[in-house]
């Protein structure tokens, strides 16, 4: 029993971490298949040992949390997730299961929709006017994004009267839908982002999520966001709604809410399989990204009888598409130095296109991955985009290996600064120990410091930082605040207008929360959540710098490893001097705490 309990705890911990990255950080760490498989494994163990089920388990809840930057909105009707399937026999089992529960012998009708890869939102209308918009959050509490939603043209601020059927507009109407960015608009957005010297978005979903959660609605207004309605969650009007989910969607369209053109009312599970196959064949030609289809029992009366679990409804499923796989030749493997000195092998490929995305390189993460694959330069490999987001080398195609392949030589010295490399974890991880003396670490540290979630200095992208560091204009993060017009005139292709905009952005960044300032320092292991907790507990940066190891270890979200990193960060003379320089009254940074 002890072993089972430990196994369950381990699965929960891993799933929560992945959920945090996906819902809060907008990062897909693993493929949907891997996540769903692990969630199912946990679910099976909890079914066998029901006394070990906890309310906080990923099987019982959704993984997002509302952020402190936004006002919280409580969902009267929870915004649930969907259970996923990947095979036809699972759909047949679903059909059989609901017929048994409903005591139904007839052919079931299903409303089938596209599973658009975007961000779920809830819109509340009263007497036809938009009152508020909220994100999913954890399913019970979301973020108020009304001002940002108001900038999306596809979202009507006022509903139009459906004179043919319902006459007056409903007193209350709560809509559920998806905010997304089309493929073409995403490419254009990234083109503009790169031209501005900023890091491009990794995928359209992340871009949509980040755009929707901007603190400044004027930024959201510049992003090409779209919206489709996929359901009604709450209604109060003179006439009753039709029982058919499909008819309700047609009614939403009559009220001015956009719905997707590929929604179909289908009779029988075999026809649903045909719909799945059809959508799979046209997937690449669609104007937006999808990762499967959604299948809903069409009768809303049946939906009520089938009910919902704590995490997902029992009357709907997401039938996911398998990740696309292609092959490519490995031209080279370069070792890249990150912000903390970790050296990562990057495989450079002959460019290939998977799901409309051109892939030129793949992060191999560590030396063990190179060894596991038995990879050599010149090999042909199979590439998969995990969750249609992260490219990954699945295997080496040994049958295509030639005599011209080369062994990957592991570096003994830092490829950037030449310092000796240290290894740990059975030599699977390589690290340059030169710190800010290493040009790569210095640039990456500065990139992190000025990033949107840190100091948010708009206009200081990677290319600008490269020039500033290469010309010796900045060395530490405090040097950013010593930049002036004369220094910036030295930069190539940087005119007076850009200089003035950057200097304004630097000045604007000086009023910042303590949490974001702590995060900006780049302490190894200190993400946004830990930084926020440290700010609430210690109140000032001076208190945090003076904190002892024991008090740090006792904090929520801070284990012994992160506590040790924080403690030693402030005991490093260079780090301490940089922090003292940053909070020097001459620079004028104003730190405040949000409780």
From Swiss-Prot:
Enzyme's top EC category: ligase
One record GO biological process: DNA repair
Name of the protein: DNA ligase
Name of a matching Pfam family: Nlig-Ia
Binding site for NAD(+): 32-36, 81-82, 113, 136, 178, 296, 320
CDD domains (alphabetical): LIGANc (cd00114)
Lineage, broadest ranks: Bacteria, Pseudomonadati, Pseudomonadota, Gammaproteobacteria, Enterobacterales
Catalysed reactions, semicolon-separated: NAD(+) + (deoxyribonucleotide)n-3'-hydroxyl + 5'-phospho-(deoxyribonucleotide)m = (deoxyribonucleotide)n+m + AMP + beta-nicotinamide D-nucleotide
Species in which this protein is naturally found: Blochmanniella pennsylvanica (strain BPEN)
Cofactor names: Mg(2+); Mn(2+)
SUPFAM superfamilies (alphabetical): DNA ligase/mRNA capping enzyme, catalytic domain, Nucleic acid-binding proteins, RuvA domain 2-like
Function as written in the Swiss-Prot or TrEMBL entry: DNA ligase that catalyzes the formation of phosphodiester linkages between 5'-phosphoryl and 3'-hydroxyl groups in double-stranded DNA using NAD as a coenzyme and as the energy source for the reaction. It is essential for DNA replication and repair of damaged DNA.
Catalytic site: 115
EC nos: 6.5.1.2
Recorded family membership: Belongs to the NAD-dependent DNA ligase family. LigA subfamily.
Binding residues for Zn(2+): 414, 417, 432, 438
GO molecular function: DNA ligase (NAD+) activity; metal ion binding
InterPro entries in alphabetical order: DisA/LigA_HHH (IPR041663), DNA_ligase (IPR001679), DNA_ligase_AS (IPR018239), DNAligase_adenylation (IPR013839), DNAligase_N (IPR013840), NA-bd_OB-fold (IPR012340), NAD_DNA_ligase_OB (IPR004150), RuvA_2-like (IPR010994)
């Amino acid at each position: 029993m002890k072993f089972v309990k430990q196994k369950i705890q381990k699965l929960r911990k891993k799933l929560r971490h992945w959920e945090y990255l996906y819902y809060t950080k907008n990062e897909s760490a693993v493929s949907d298949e891997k996540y769903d498989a692990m969630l199912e494994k946990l679910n099976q163990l909890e079914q066998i040992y029901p006394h070990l089920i906890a309310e906080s388990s990923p099987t019982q809840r959704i993984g997002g949390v509302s952020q402190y930057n936004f006002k919280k909105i409580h969902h009267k009707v929870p915004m649930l997730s969907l259970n996923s399937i990947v095979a036809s026999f699972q759909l047949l089992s679903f059909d059989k299961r609901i017929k048994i529960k409903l005591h139904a012998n007839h052919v079931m009708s299903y409303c089938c929709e596209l599973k658009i890869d975007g961000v779920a939102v809830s819109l509340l209308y009263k007497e036809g006017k938009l009152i508020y918009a909220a994100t999913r959050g954890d399913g019970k509490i979301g973020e108020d994004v009304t001002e940002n939603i108001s900038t999306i043209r596809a979202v009507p601020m006022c509903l139009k009267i459906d004179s043919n059927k319902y006459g007056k507009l409903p007193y209350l109407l709560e809509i559920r839908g998806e905010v997304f960015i089309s493929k073409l608009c995403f490419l254009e957005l990234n083109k503009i982002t790169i031209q501005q010297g900023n890091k491009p978005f990794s995928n359209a979903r992340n871009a949509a999520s980040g755009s929707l959660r901007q603190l400044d609605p004027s930024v959201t207004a510049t992003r090409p966001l779209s919206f489709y309605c996929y359901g009604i969650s709450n209604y109060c009007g003179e006439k009753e709604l039709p029982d058919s989910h499909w008819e309700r969607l047609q009614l939403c369209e009559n009220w001015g809410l956009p719905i997707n053109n590929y929604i179909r009312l289908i009779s029988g599970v075999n026809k649903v399989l045909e719909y799945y196959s059809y959508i799979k064949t046209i997937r690449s030609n669609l104007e937006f990204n999808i990762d499967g289809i959604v299948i809903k029992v069409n009768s809303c009366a049946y939906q009520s009888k089938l009910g919902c679990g704590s995490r997902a409804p029992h009357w709907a499923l997401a039938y996911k598409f398998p990740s696309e796989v292609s092959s490519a030749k490995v031209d080279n493997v370069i070792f890249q130095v990150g912000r903390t000195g970790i050296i990562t092998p990057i495989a450079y490929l002959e460019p290939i296109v998977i799901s409309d995305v051109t892939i030129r390189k793949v992060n191999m993460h560590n030396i063990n991955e190179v060894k596991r694959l038995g990879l050599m330069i010149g090999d042909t490999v199979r590439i998969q985009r995990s969750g249609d987001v992260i490219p990954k080398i699945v295997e080496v195609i040994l049958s295509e290996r030639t005599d011209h392949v080369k062994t990957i030589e592991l570096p003994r010295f830092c490829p950037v600064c030449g310092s000796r490399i240290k290894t740990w974890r059975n030599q699977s991880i390589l690290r340059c120990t030169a710190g800010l003396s290493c040009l790569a670490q210095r640039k990456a540290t500065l990139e992190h410091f000025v990033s949107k979630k840190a100091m948010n200095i708009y206009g200081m992208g990677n290319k600008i930082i490269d020039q500033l560091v290469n010309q010796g204009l900045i060395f530490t993060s405090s040097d950013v605040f010593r930049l002036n017009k004369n220094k910036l005139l030295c930069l190539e292709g940087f005119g007076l207008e850009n200089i003035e905009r950057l200097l304004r952005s630097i000045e604007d960044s000086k009023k910042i929360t303590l949490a974001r300032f702590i995060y900006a320092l780049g302490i190894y292991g200190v993400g946004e959540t830990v930084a926020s907790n440290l700010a609430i507990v210690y109140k000032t940066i001076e208190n945090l710098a003076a904190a002892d190891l024991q008090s740090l270890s006792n904090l929520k979200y801070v284990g012994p490893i992160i506590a040790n990193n924080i403690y030693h960060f402030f005991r490093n003379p260079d780090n301490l001097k940089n922090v003292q320089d940053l909070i020097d009254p001459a620079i004028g940074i104003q730190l405040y705490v949000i409780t």
